[in-house]
UniProtKB/Swiss-Prot annotation:
Gene3D superfamilies, per database record: 2.40.128.20
Biological processes per GO annotation: cellular response to cadmium ion; cellular response to hydrogen peroxide; cellular response to zinc ion starvation; intracellular zinc ion homeostasis
Entry binding sites for Zn(2+) 2: H176, E212, H216
Name of the protein this chain belongs to: Metal-binding protein ZinT
Gene Ontology cellular component annotations, sorted alphabetically: cytosol; outer membrane-bounded periplasmic space
Gene of this entry: zinT
Organism name: Escherichia coli (strain K12)
Length: 216
């Protein structure tokens, strides 16, 4: 049964605060990262350490950060990146993230194996089955893991295939994630490197999202 928007709204004070194991102020995303987890978050890990995960790792209500980019609220984040990387200008970095964050799905709710997508006052949902993971090696030499899920309901208008990437390689509650969505195949999504809509916990204010991004 689909998660209803009103249910998500009512639950904001209880459900989504606990679901991502996210405590703002102390930047606590559950238990502290181990050395292996910290290296994995930076794209360095042994393939043998990658483990399967369940959809419950992404349980919660999540907001797209694309509107924050469009409003200019993420400019301090891009400026920090430009200051740290002298090979790219602020404008180049912002353009890169503009392409990456672009999406019309404003909110995502995840509960009991069901993912609900909210777009322009329209809602689609489906129960997703786990389809394994894929380890990717990027041009930079760093690696990442995508966790694959499939909607097998032919009547659903939700994306047939979705993939999560959150810099985590083993079971752990997510604090933010990139998601890849489509109807062609998992492989076509694995080839997508330029558009990775990004979501943070819904209860965070824009200032808190910026603070989170600046701390990483």
């Amino acid at each position: 049964m689909a998660i209803r928007l009103y249910k998500l709204a009512v639950a904001l004070g209880v459900f989504i605060v606990s679901a991502p194991a996210f405590s703002h102020g102390h930047h606590s995303h559950g238990k502290p990262l181990t050395e292996v987890e910290q290296k994995a978050a930076n794209g360095v890990f042994d393939d043998a350490n990658v483990q399967n995960r369940t959809l419950s790792d992404w349980d919660g209500v999540w907001q797209s950060v694309y509107p924050l980019l469009q409003s200019g609220k993420l400019d301090p984040v891009f400026q920090k990146k430009a200051d740290a990387d002298k090979t790219k200008t602020f404008a180049e970095i912002k353009d890169y993230y503009h392409k990456g964050y672009a999406t019309d799905i404003e909110m995502i709710g995840i509960e009991d194996g069901i993912v609900e997508f909210h777009r322009n006052n329209e809602t689609t949902s489906c129960k997703y089955d786990y389809d394994g993971y894929k380890i990717l090696t990027y041009k930079s030499g760093k690696k990442g893991v995508r966790y694959l899920f499939e909607c097998k309901d032919p009547e659903s208008k939700a994306p047939k295939y979705i993939q999560f990437s959150d810099h985590i390689i083993a079971p752990r509650k997510s604090s933010h994630f990139h998601i890849f969505m489509g109807n062609d195949s998992q492989q076509s999504l694995l080839n997508e490197m330029e558009n990775w809509p990004t979501y943070y916990p819904y209860q965070l204010s824009s200032e808190e999202v910026v603070e989170e991004m600046m701390s990483h």
